[in-house]
Amino acid sequence: MDPFLLAAAHLLLRADRPEVIEESCQISSLLTGNTDYARCQATVLRETLLKGGLDQTVLDLLAGDQREATELVFEREEEDPVETSRQFGNNCHLPGSFQGALHAFLHHRESEDRFQETLRAVLRAGGCNCSRANYAGALLGASGAVIPSNWLDRLNRAEDIVNTIQRAANISHLGEGK
């Protein structure tokens, strides 16, 4: 999961570009030689961002083991996300970490408190939950979910974080138009 997370910011800042999936795979390959799941994760996140949500039509963009792993998540969408994540594998290995994050996101996507419920389900599943939480958070943000204000109130150095994000966005667009 971590190799894709290295590329997530690039994808989110440039989702409108058709070549962003391949660029994300190139970035991910800096940490791993296998980019099959990075491509899957990038495709799912990009579709979520471009459509403001996610449905099973994303399966048409996937192939092989990655499609099968994603299909299984949709098939089990109604099941308890904590137990399902444990069954997929609650460590950092793929496809389990991808499946656990995606499952929690899909399971809670209609909830008014989807941000909190999704991330709390990811955390309650235990194991190495940081990668799952990062990917679930990216899916939530891409779908328009908002970090609850009472969570932001407890955040240290929020202004520094916002400034860093703005600088990164500005840097990412410097080379465009060449």
For every predicted segment, state its role.
Residues 16-20, 110-114, 143-155:
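Phosphate-handling active-site elements
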Residues 1-109, 118-125, 139:
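Amphipathic alpha-helical interface segments
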Residues 142-178:
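Conserved glycine-rich phosphate/nucleotide-binding loop
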Residues 133-144:
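Short, small-residue alpha-helix embedded
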